[in-house]
């Protein structure tokens, strides 16, 4: 289990605070482009009396994919069924889930890129024709029977859209990239959560927590609860700027929202490899983290903040990374990598 305070992976305590999640689209903070699209598509589907087309949310973890799926189910008047790619081991497991759905239900599959191929193929007729093809018998006596399914909506979520097979990706009618939240959006989320949790917090403290939350609501809510703990013991239960800073410093969350592992990645590239480029396998060895963990959990935020960039030859540190470590940046020695070049991240899959 990942016990980092800054991990965007869902922890047990995050699930326990279900009441922090908005229940309506107009209560959902951030992701304005996604909200606008989904509002139109939901209203159009309801107007025609149809199920909403299948939706794919993709982006780093902790940005609200599951919350949006729950809101969509409520807006469509159906129930939400939640599962994940690794949990569906056999085609029969998925068939049982599909046959248990009702009209306008939403089936949410997290980590959908991890579905195995035999299971994935069951989804094709289910998504296209609302039908389930079942093989009965074996050998020459085997025959295929098609069962009709209720009109449902499949919502897939993935942190690695590039790993989806083309046949599966092409069957989604709505594709929505999820973006990191800005500080003001996170501040609004923190103020809302504080009201629900009955936390006495001022705006400066809320903004301080927001700025260290890695653009991720899940992390913002987790940090809020840890700052509350500190304030209850050290600050008479009042979360102000001073108590927020002291609590976050105690948690070793710096002004950029980095923890020790983020800094290890930057330090490895700068100090051990002269700024790069360095391959992901080598970087993984030096940092002591799995490749998938670096790519899914750490890199997206470091890229978005402009501290590293990905090139065909490997990862490179930017001038901003050198400034963060207070290491001199030599243009001739370290190449021409600058913060503007990190727009490359937006073009990457």
UniProtKB/Swiss-Prot annotation:
- Binding-site residues, ATP: 20-21, 62, 65-67, 128-130, 171, 181, 218
| Top-level taxon of origin | Bacteria
Q: Which GO terms describe its cellular component?
A: cytoplasm; Holliday junction resolvase complex
Question: Which residues make up the binding site for DNA?
Answer: 310, 315
InterPro entries in the record? AAA+_ATPase, AAA_lid_4, DNA_helicase_Holl-junc_RuvB, P-loop_NTPase, RuvB-like_N, RuvB_C, WH-like_DNA-bd_sf, WH_DNA-bd_sf
Q: Where is it localised?
A: Cytoplasm
Q: Name one GO biological process term.
A: DNA recombination
Give the Gene3D superfamilies listed for this entry. Answer: 1.10.8.60, P-loop containing nucleotide triphosphate hydrolases (3.40.50.300), Winged helix-like DNA-binding domain superfamily/Winged helix DNA-binding domain (1.10.10.10)
Q: Which residues bind Mg(2+)?
A: 66
Domain remarks in the Swiss-Prot or TrEMBL record: Has 3 domains, the large (RuvB-L) and small ATPase (RuvB-S) domains and the C-terminal head (RuvB-H) domain. The head domain binds DNA, while the ATPase domains jointly bind ATP, ADP or are empty depending on the state of the subunit in the translocation cycle. During a single DNA translocation step the structure of each domain remains the same, but their relative positions change.
Question: What function is annotated for this protein?
Answer: The RuvA-RuvB-RuvC complex processes Holliday junction (HJ) DNA during genetic recombination and DNA repair, while the RuvA-RuvB complex plays an important role in the rescue of blocked DNA replication forks via replication fork reversal (RFR). RuvA specifically binds to HJ cruciform DNA, conferring on it an open structure. The RuvB hexamer acts as an ATP-dependent pump, pulling dsDNA into and through the RuvAB complex. RuvB forms 2 homohexamers on either side of HJ DNA bound by 1 or 2 RuvA tetramers; 4 subunits per hexamer contact DNA at a time.
Protein name stated in the entry? Holliday junction branch migration complex subunit RuvB
- The protein's organism comes out as Clostridium acetobutylicum (strain ATCC 824 / DSM 792 / JCM 1419 / IAM 19013 / LMG 5710 / NBRC 13948 / NRRL B-527 / VKM B-1787 / 2291 / W)
Tell me the name of the encoding gene. ruvB
């Amino acid at each position: 289990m990942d016990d980092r305070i800054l991990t965007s992976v869902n922890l047990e305590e995050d699930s326990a605070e279900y009441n922090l999640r908005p229940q309506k689209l107009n209560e959902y903070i951030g992701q304005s482009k996604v909200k606008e699209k989904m509002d139109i598509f939901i209203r159009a589907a309801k107007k025609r009396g149809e199920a909403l087309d299948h939706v794919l949310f993709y982006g780093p973890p902790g940005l609200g994919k599951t919350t949006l799926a729950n809101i969509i189910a409520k807006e469509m008047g159906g129930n939400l069924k939640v599962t994940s790619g690794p949990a569906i081991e056999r085609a029969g497991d998925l068939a049982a889930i599909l046959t248990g759905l009702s009209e306008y239900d939403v089936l949410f599959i997290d980590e959908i890129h991890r579905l195995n191929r035999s299971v994935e193929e069951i989804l094709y007729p289910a998504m296209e024709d609302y039908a389930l093809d079942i093989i009965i018998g074996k050998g020459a006596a085997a025959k295929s029977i098609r069962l009709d399914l209720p009109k449902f909506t499949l919502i897939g979520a993935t942190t690695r859209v590039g790993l989806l097979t083309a046949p599966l990706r092409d069957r989604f009618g709505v594709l929505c990239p999820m973006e990191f939240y800005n500080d003001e959006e996170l501040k609004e989320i923190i103020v809302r959560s504080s009201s629900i949790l009955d936390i006495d917090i001022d705006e400066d403290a809320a903004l301080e927590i927001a700025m260290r939350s890695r653009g991720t609501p899940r992390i913002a809510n987790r940090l809020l609860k840890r700052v509350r703990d500190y304030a209850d013991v050290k600050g008479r239960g009042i979360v102000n700027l001073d108590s927020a800073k002291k609590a976050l410093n105690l948690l070793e969350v710096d002004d950029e929202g980095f923890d020790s592992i983020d800094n290890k990645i930057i330090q490895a590239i700068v100090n051990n490899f002269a700024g790069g480029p360095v391959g992901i396998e080598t970087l993984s060895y030096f940092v002591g983290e799995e490749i998938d963990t670096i790519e899914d959990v750490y890199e997206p935020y470091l890229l978005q903040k402009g501290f590293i960039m990905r090139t065909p030859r490997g990862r490179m540190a930017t001038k901003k990374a050198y400034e963060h470590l207070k290491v001199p940046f030599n243009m001739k020695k370290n190449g021409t990598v600058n913060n503007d070049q990190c727009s490359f991240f937006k073009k990457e899959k």
